[in-house]
Amino acid sequence: LRLTGDQLLAMLSALANPHRLRIVAALQKDGRNYVSQLAREVGISRPLLHLHLQKLEEAGLVTSKLELSSDGKALNYFEVAKFEFELTPAAIAQAAKSLTDSGK
């Protein structure tokens, strides 16, 4: 996967936080999960988890899907998005060529 400079910055920025790394790791290990369960597993509050999930989703690292449980409650499930990229000096140089003003 060839990333633009802005995409690479968003992904690296999103992963530059220990909570977000743990969230991605937990979702990778256990598969999709909903916010309350994931907050317990990662050991952070639901509001803080929401902020981190939003950042991860904006970077394209996780996806969400709203579903109804058997008792009619709306649950927002999150899972790791399929992504793979090789971080090499050449890949960074290539991505840097496409940086926009917002990626400075």
Regions found by a protein language model. Name each.
Residues 64:
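Short beta-strand "wing" residues that participate in macromolecule-binding interfaces
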Residues 60:
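Glycine-centered, phosphate/nucleic-acid-interacting loop/turn motifs that mediate DNA/RNA or nucleotide
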Residues 7-45, 67-69, 74-79:
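N-terminal helix-turn-helix DNA-binding core of bacterial DNA-binding proteins
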